[in-house]
């Protein structure tokens, strides 16, 4: 039974990731006035499966000078963390009902840094190492703003439990009442998942392919799956935090559909941003966080600390 539960939890995520790659190629294609994949299957719908078969049947090569154990463990760790992040998410029911769900998510997103660092170092390539160091600096930096924004949301919510956020947002979504936080959170998630315009780790023009330059076949596919699973997970977390309750009178299946639609909308915005904006320069990326986001998030956090004290408020779910 446990294995069945695990499979029913992992397979839909991997299917969603597979079709996200197809949607991305289609959306980017239409935005650039071309068709995108349309050969394999009707309207190119079987393209992700063809890619998966091709990648997993090829021989996994590795550089002679690489560190074998770390080189193999890095993609496995990346995919494991990307799948584990989903466990506490209420959609509307979660696999693990954690009281400290948000801390769990924050800790796991911090752990993903190690897989990138291992892959860059174990490849024994200067391009991979530079890409990995960029990724680590970027991820750790933007986690600071993510943590402070989460703290502000938790001060409004009154607990670290994700399920209570739907009660908090019964009247108004937090994306309306705390829009500066939501805006900074969304931009920080773009940086956290290494997406354009913050994709400095995979800068093709300067670093060939970044930290995964020496990976091929299966291990490369695992990094690819981890990246896209993280994108969907981050947008699901954004939906829970800022676009919570759907007011459907406990109709679980309708709740799930509305949750899915909101997450899809945010994911499409990720693709739109990728198609629209050029890559940031590295110093601009760091200045955006340390000189703009950090002072703003700290000021807003202090505001949300002082507001309940000044108005003698109690958490919404009590």
From Swiss-Prot:
InterPro entries: NADH_UbQ_OxRdtase_su1/FPO (IPR001694), NADH_UbQ_OxRdtase_su1_CS (IPR018086). It comes from the Eukaryota. PROSITE patterns: COMPLEX1_ND1_1, COMPLEX1_ND1_2. GO terms for molecular function: NADH dehydrogenase (ubiquinone) activity. The keyword Endoplasmic reticulum does not apply. GO terms for biological process: aerobic respiration. One of its GO terms (cellular component) is mitochondrial inner membrane. Pfam families: NADHdh. It is found in: Mitochondrion inner membrane. It is a multi-pass membrane protein. Its EC number is 7.1.1.2. Keywords: Electron transport, Membrane, Mitochondrion, Mitochondrion inner membrane, NAD, Respiratory chain, Translocase, Transmembrane, Transmembrane helix, Transport, Ubiquinone. The chain crosses the membrane at residues 3-23, 68-88, 100-120, 136-156, 172-192, 222-242, 253-273, 294-314. It catalyses: a ubiquinone + NADH + 5 H(+)(in) = a ubiquinol + NAD(+) + 4 H(+)(out). Belongs to the complex I subunit 1 family. HAMAP family: NDH1_NuoH (MF_01350). Core subunit of the mitochondrial membrane respiratory chain NADH dehydrogenase (Complex I) that is believed to belong to the minimal assembly required for catalysis. Complex I functions in the transfer of electrons from NADH to the respiratory chain. The immediate electron acceptor for the enzyme is believed to be ubiquinone. This is NADH-ubiquinone oxidoreductase chain 1. The lineage of its organism: Eukaryota, Metazoa, Chordata, Craniata, Vertebrata. The gene is MT-ND1.
């Amino acid at each position: 039974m446990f294995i069945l539960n695990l499979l029913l939890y992992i397979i839909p995520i991997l299917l969603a990731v597979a079709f996200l790659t197809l949607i991305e190629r289609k959306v980017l294609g239409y935005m650039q006035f071309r068709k995108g994949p349309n050969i394999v299957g009707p309207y190119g719908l079987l393209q992700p499966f063809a890619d998966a078969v091709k990648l997993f049947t090829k021989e996994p090569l590795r550089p002679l000078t690489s560190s074998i154990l770390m080189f193999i463990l890095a993609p496995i760790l990346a995919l494991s963390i990307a799948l584990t992040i989903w466990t506490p998410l209420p959609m509307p029911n979660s696999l693990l009902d954690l009281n400290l769900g948000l801390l769990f998510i924050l800790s796991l997103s911090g752990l993903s840094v190690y897989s990138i660092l291992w892959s860059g170092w174990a490849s024994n390539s200067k391009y991979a190492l530079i890409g990995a160091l960029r990724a680590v600096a970027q991820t750790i930096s933007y986690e600071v703003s993510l943590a402070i924004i989460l703290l502000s949301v938790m001060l409004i919510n009154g607990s670290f439990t994700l399920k209570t956020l739907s009660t908090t947002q019964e009247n108004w979504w937090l994306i309306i009442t705390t829009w500066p936080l939501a805006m900074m959170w969304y931009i920080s998630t773009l940086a956290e998942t290494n997406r354009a315009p913050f994709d400095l780790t995979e800068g093709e023009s300067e670093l060939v392919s970044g930290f995964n330059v020496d990976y091929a076949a299966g291990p490369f596919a695992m990094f690819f799956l981890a990246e896209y699973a993280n994108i969907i997970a981050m947008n699901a977390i954004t939906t829970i935090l800022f676009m919570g309750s759907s007011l459907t009178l406990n109709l679980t299946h309708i709740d799930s559909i509305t949750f899915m639609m909101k997450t899809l909308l945010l994911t499409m915005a990720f693709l739109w941003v990728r198609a629209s904006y050029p890559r940031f320069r590295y110093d601009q990326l760091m200045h955006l966080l340390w000189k703009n986001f950090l002072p703003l998030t700290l000021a807003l956090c202090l505001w949300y600390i002082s507001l309940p004290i000044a108005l003698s408020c109690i958490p919404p779910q009590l």
